[in-house]
Amino acid sequence: MKKWGVGFTLLLASTSILAKDIQLLNVSYDPTRELYEQYNKAFSAHWKQETGDNVVIRQSHGGSGKQATSVINGIEADVVTLALAYDVDAIAERGRIDKNWIKRLPDNSAPYTSTIVFLVRKGNPKQIHDWNDLIKPGVSVITPNPKSSGGARWNYLAAWGYALHHNNNDQAKAQDFVKALFKNVEVLDSGARGSTNTFVERGIGDVLIAWENEALLATNELGKDKFEIVTPSESILAEPTVSMVDKVVEKKDTKAVAEAYLKYLYSPEGQEIAAKNFYRPRDADVAKKYDDAFPKLKLFTIDEVFGGWAKAQKDHFANGGTFDQISKR
């Protein structure tokens, strides 16, 4: 027995010596803090069980466009989990991510979805019910800046798509509609969480154009006695995307764990965590379980209405694009 005990002790010691300590950096967009705090704990436990290795995931959050720029400029993110595919494409264009990144994971590397809704104050005093109510005189709108925020670009395109569908696809009328909406914007923060804080904490504005997950988080955390969610008649299907940063994981030798980290987002546990944090899950079984949590509405895609992100970025958000044109007061 003594001999067996010594051998077992040596086995434990050797296992402990072989276990690695790994660090990953996830550079993400603004309102995913709570999601990834929970997900990182779950993945670390999963990876420990699978491999014996200890993995610690650090998080960085900000406007999606600014976060992409930080990765382009050299911040050593192992993975990016950004608000939209264009921001990942921008990193890929600089050679830091494989240009075929979007095909590496299911659903075009978008493991969960969201949409754009309105958060209003209790009682809905300005009677906000749909996009057309946001252009009424005297309505103060809060939304982030599309130049820095991915969420803001989804907001803008959701409004534009609504205007197209209600004006026989007349682009000029859609531009007039979105221009009128932005004339009512009181504060343009750099990111979605900043806009939420402006509306919720600082008490500025009548309506916040928000990620659905951010609106649900605000009502659940701060109380339904203070805010209400208004789901418009139609909105855009927002598809946040994820990728490992090839140049970084090759340099740091973290490719295996970075790949596993992103793939686990599609697992039943990963999908459950996404749903609990008010993102719409891709997994059909998990989606069915949370069916009552997400209102039904007509959703259109960026490909259907805008011809994809590359075209939308060029037409609307590049220097001299329609956002710059409508921003001239």
For each feature predicted by the language model, list its residue ranges.
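Alpha-to-beta junction loops
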Residues: 74-80, 138-139, 202-207
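Ligand-binding "clamshell"
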Residues: 91-106, 217-231
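Early extracytoplasmic/lumenal segment of secretory-pathway proteins
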Residues: 19-94, 104-105, 211
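Ligand-binding pocket segment of bilobal, Venus flytrap-like solute-binding proteins
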Residues: 166-233
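A conserved helix-loop-strand patch within extracytoplasmic ligand-binding domains
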Residues: 92-165
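Extracellular/periplasmic juxtamembrane helices and adjacent flexible linkers that interface
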Residues: 249-329
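A bilobed periplasmic-binding-protein/Venus flytrap-type ligand-binding module shared by bacterial periplasmic
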Residues: 116-124, 239-256, 273-277
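N-terminal signal peptide c-region/cleavage motif recognized by signal peptidases
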Residues: 14-16
